[in-house]
A protein has these predicted regions:
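Catalytic-site beta-strand/loop segments enriched in glycine and acidic/polar residues
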Residues: 118-152, 156
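Residue-level preference for the first positions of well-ordered beta-strands
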Residues: 51-55, 74, 128-132
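Short gly/pro/ser/thr-enriched loop/turn and capping motifs at secondary-structure boundaries
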Residues: 84-86, 107-108, 141, 167-172
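Membrane-anchoring hydrophobic helices of lipid-metabolizing enzymes
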Residues: 1-69, 90, 96-98, 215-216, ...
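A cross-family acyltransferase "interaction/gating" segment
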Residues: 143-204
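Membrane-interfacial amphipathic helices and adjacent loop/beta segments
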Residues: 16-37, 76-123
Length: 273
């Protein structure tokens, strides 16, 4: 990208237009989709111990506004300091959520940004805001929780709640997290897992156990979310990368989703989706 194009891409006009389009598209997906919840009262479970720490996988991050928090509930979300994240930050703010800036590019900047993000997350939780973040982060590996979320729970004393938002129709992008672009006119599943609490005075062993529990909890709720998207007797169309559709099976077995879950979900599932 040339300097001129980079400057244009990071301009206030492009950021404003891009975030407005992103907000419109996400609202369009939500409003044209049939929402199913597990448990039925997801708000009650999500906010029973407010403020909490919402955890999700990066690949299923797009539909986080579908959680639809109560009007008087403050939610903060971490966003990278990288210039490319400005549209994302503005989009989140358009949904009435607070933004906490995380790490930027480069190792030293990432280290400084990570410490600043942790301080910002602690301040948000102390102020009474539920804090949402992806347990995995670029450049990966995908679906491997970092120790930071366990440390945040320890320092704040707040529980971690695994969440998943998935649609049965989507495009999986060819990115490090296989980020899913959710499509309109879908079945949108919102699944909330059980809270994970870090023991008081936890050491490195307990923090690692918490990290593994977050991974397991997120894999479970994500599998359940895609399982709720089943439809019978439909053709199966999967996307290996953006704009590269390929037919994987002519006809699906009854009871499965018309758009299958991502390959990593299917390979980790204990039950057939």
């Amino acid at each position: 990208m040339t300097a001129t194009l980079r400057k244009l891409y990071h301009s206030n006009v492009v950021t404003a237009v891009g975030s407005a389009l992103a907000e419109f598209y996400i609202r369009f997906v939500i409003r044209t989709s049939r929402v199913v919840r597990d448990p039925p009262d997801t708000d009650g479970k999500l906010f029973s111990q407010h403020p909490q720490i919402f955890a999700m996988w990066h690949g299923q991050f797009m539909m986080v506004p579908a959680i639809r928090p109560q009007a008087d509930t403050d939610i903060a979300i971490i966003v990278s300091r990288h210039g490319d994240a400005e549209i994302l930050a503005n989009t989140i703010q358009r949904f009435g959520m607070r933004v906490v800036r995380g790490a930027g590019a480069g190792r030293r900047r990432k280290d400084r940004g990570g410490a600043a993000a942790l301080r910002g997350a602690l301040r948000a939780l102390k102020d009474g805001a539920t804090f949402a973040l992806t347990a995995d982060a670029p450049p990966g590996p995908a679906r491997k929780a970092g120790i930071g979320i366990a440390l945040l729970a320890k320092l704040s004393g707040r529980p971690i709640v695994p969440c998943a938002m998935a649609t049965n129709r989507y495009v999986a992008l060819n990115s490090w997290s296989a980020f899913t672009l959710n499509l309109p006119f879908s079945k949108l599943a919102i699944v909330v897992g059980d809270p994970i609490v870090v023991p008081e005075g936890a050491g490195s062993i307990e923090l690692e156990a918490t990290r593994l529990a977050v991974e397991q909890g997120l894999n479970e709720v994500t599998q359940r979310a895609y399982g709720l998207g089943r439809r019978e007797g439909s053709s199966r169309l999967s996307y290996a990368a953006w704009g590269t559709p390929k037919r994987s099976d002519a006809v699906m077995a009854p009871g499965r989703a018309d758009y299958p879950a991502p390959a990593w979900v299917r390979s980790n599932a204990t039950n057939t989706l």
